[in-house]
Each structure stands twice: as structure tokens, then as C-alpha cells.
UniProtKB/Swiss-Prot annotation:
Signal peptide span: 1-27
This protein's encoding gene: AGP41
Function: Proteoglycan that seems to be implicated in diverse developmental roles such as differentiation, cell-cell recognition, embryogenesis and programmed cell death.
Highest taxon listed in the record's lineage: Eukaryota
The protein's name: Arabinogalactan protein 41
Major location (coarse): membrane
Membrane topology: Lipid-anchor; GPI-anchor
Record-linked InterPro entries: AGP16/20/22/41
Species of origin: Arabidopsis thaliana (Mouse-ear cress)
């Protein structure tokens, strides 16, 4: 009886240790977020340049 009790105690302790350590061994660090390729100010500036060019062409054609 003592041998099976000892085996049960050792196997319980080993299984608890594995249950704690194995998930930590497989964990991966989070990858950093990629840098934004374009933000809103770049798009707004592009639209502003196009509108200024249209206004310049219209002013040239009207006069």
C-alpha cells in the first residue's frame, strides 16, 4: 500500500510540475505591430495638392 501511495504522490507532483512548465515552454512573445504605411495626413495632403492644381488650371482657363 505504501508503494502505490508513494507512486501516486510522485506522479501527482510530476504532473503538476509539467502542467505549469510546459505551457511556458511553448509560449511565444508577441510580435510588434507593423508601422502604418500611410496615415491620414498624407492622404489629405495629396487631395489638397490635386484641388490646388484643379484651381490653378481653372484660373488659367477662365482668364
Amino acid at each position: 500500500m505504501s508503494g502505490s501511495r508513494l507512486f501516486f504522490g510522485v506522479s501527482t507532483i510530476v504532473s503538476i510540475i509539467f502542467a505549469i512548465l510546459l505551457p511556458m515552454a511553448h509560449a511565444q512573445s508577441a510580435a510588434p505591430a507593423p508601422a502604418p504605411t500611410s496615415d491620414g495626413t498624407t492622404i489629405d495632403q495629396g487631395i489638397a495638392y490635386v484641388l490646388m492644381l484643379v484651381a490653378l488650371v481653372l484660373t488659367y482657363l477662365i482668364h
